[in-house]
Amino acid sequence: MPRERDSTDHSNMKEEGGSDLSVRSRKRKANVAVFLQDPDEEIAKIDKTVKSEDSSQPWDDNSACVDPCSFIPTPNKEEDNELEYPRTAFQPRKIRPPRASPLPVLNWGNREEVWRIMLNKEKTYLRDEHFLQRHPLLQARMRAVLLDWLMEVCEVYKLHRETFYLAQDFFDRYMASQHNIIKTLLQLIGISALFIASKLEEIYPPKLHQFAYVTDGACSGDEILTMELMMMKALKWRLSPLTIVSWLNVYVQVAYVNDTGEVLMPQYPQQVFVQIAELLDLCVLDVGCLEFPYGVLAASALYHFSSLELMQKVSGYQWCDIEKCVKWMVPFAMVIREMGSSKLKHFRGVPMEDSHNIQTHTNSLDLLDKAQAKKAILSEQNRISPPPSVVLTPPPSSKKQSSEQETE
């Protein structure tokens, strides 16, 4: 009997071991599937799960009762394209549908689905234009100096424009989540944001000691690593926004798309892209840019170098959507036009077809001072003599002649 019991136990152990192996293999496959998912989609699923768990709490007698009929869907009900508020004494408001997709037919995906994901990015990654109120010891000029320095670092290490704009987004969103940051920490936060962005975007990012070197001893490698973890926790690991330059790349690509509809490789003139990107490089130094979504900023910059019709075609925006941003961007566009378009820079080791994507640095702070001076002059002129609300048209020629005869 002991031998039979031992053999039985041994067989049970084998069965349990086999089940463990199958469970482990399934876990490995599940981990691979999770790894291949979009990080934003995974975070959204986690948030949805947490909300569902909160909704499944025990019944609370003190909670307000809700009409159960509101949870019963009406069968065979046609959905309206525009949702309307219930009619009241006030004028009913309508929710505007999302702007139409300007993307061409894609051979690698559904253009409507791609456009929907792009629009959801703007809703997910929000910024706070008043984040400096959380930091009484900081000024808007300090942010401009830091971003100008990050542009210079990007040019030295031949980093892409997308890398810089990712770092700018990480910095602004991190500062909006903190309080009472002192001036001496700004450089550490900025270089840590660029360190994170370079690992996400660059194929061969600079080493950690290279980022510490450009700070001239102000930040050590260990401090950058510590700040990196603090920033990612504060950002809740949301590290894949659609930046300003990403929107610009889409708009210009759609504007110059060929008959084949191929959009995987750039089809636009590099000089055109660089000229508009220089305007955005200047605008992003002003903290006022945080008032507008990234897509609106890119569309407004494109408008200043093209036309209203082209902007509407490639972005889906209407004039009312970008009017405020276009007017805000006027002094910056005036400075860029006075400076003239800079020549396309070529970098050693960078292919010619990718040279326009490398972040460049100019005397951005001087240009920012000129733009802010023009902004003050324009605001003063508008205060003294505000522009007419309607377009004035001359009278017909027949009335002109009759009025002239009467005066004689």
Swiss-Prot record:
GO terms for molecular function: cyclin-dependent protein serine/threonine kinase regulator activity; kinase activity; protein kinase binding. Phosphorylation of both Thr-393 by GSK3 and Ser-397 by CDK2 creates a high affinity degron recognized by FBXW7, and accelerates degradation via the ubiquitin proteasome pathway. Phosphorylation at Thr-74 creates a low affinity degron also recognized by FBXW7. Ubiquitinated by UHRF2; appears to occur independently of phosphorylation. Found in adult spleen, and to a lesser extent in adult testis and brain. Residues 1-17 have a biased composition (Basic and acidic residues). It is found in: Nucleus. Pfam families: Cyclin_C (PF02984), Cyclin_N (PF00134). Residues 1-27, 379-408 are annotated as: Disordered. The modification Phosphoserine is found at residues 101, 385, 397. Residues 385-397 have a biased composition (Pro residues). The modification Phosphothreonine is found at residues 74, 393. The keyword DNA damage does not apply. One of its GO terms (biological process) is G1/S transition of mitotic cell cycle. It comes from the Eukaryota. One of its GO terms (cellular component) is nucleus. Keywords: Cell cycle, Cell division, Cyclin, Nucleus, Phosphoprotein, Ubl conjugation. SMART domains: CYCLIN, Cyclin_C. Essential for the control of the cell cycle at the G1/S (start) transition. Belongs to the cyclin family. Cyclin E subfamily. Interacts with CDK2 protein kinase to form a serine/threonine kinase holoenzyme complex. The cyclin subunit imparts substrate specificity to the complex. Part of a complex consisting of UHRF2, CDK2 and CCNE1. Interacts directly with UHRF2; the interaction ubiquitinates CCNE1 and appears to occur independently of CCNE1 phosphorylation. Found in a complex with CDK2, CABLES1 and CCNA1. Interacts with INCA1. This is G1/S-specific cyclin-E1. It comes from Mus musculus. The gene is Ccne1.
